[in-house]
Amino acid sequence: MMHPWHDVSPGKELPRDFQALIEIPLGSNVKYELDKPTGLLKVDRIIHSAVFYPANYGFIPQTYAEDNDPLDVLVLCQEAVQPLALIKARAIGVMTMIDGGASDDKIIAVATNDPEFSDYLEARDLPPHRLLVLKRFFQDYKQLEGKQVQVEDIRPAYAALTIIEKSLARYQELKEKLIKGEAHE
């Protein structure tokens, strides 16, 4: 069986353009996440209250972020994308959350095949309200669960590209350690 984290290419035009694997569709209040051992999606939780994902949410294959998971990505698109679907995306910014004292980066991207979003190159060019919605979603859903989180200002595309490059390199390091038997996922 193919594993979506390990066996799917992140793309050929990295780091700016990449393939994102969607875990959670736009508008969902079910938080799915990758089950690392099996590669299947599992239901992590149902979000408290009437709070819904403001974008398609997933990860970039063959990346390993500082939170020891694949690198998270929010893909702006007109439509909800089915879980485990691949979508071509372009990084336009990054939002960093401080969750339990740990840094958790969320790449902000646009679907390159969606005519409503494909021309955006920088998050700052989006309507200000859309950026506010992205930030508030993560603040609100954590607070509704009784957790404190700090959502930092959204940074430009060049910051996202650096994080993507580092996460791709960290994945290769992890892969080499796994092959040698020196690490566990």
PLM feature spans:
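Hydrophobic N-terminal alpha-helices or hydrophobic patches in metabolic proteins across all domains
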Residues: 1-185
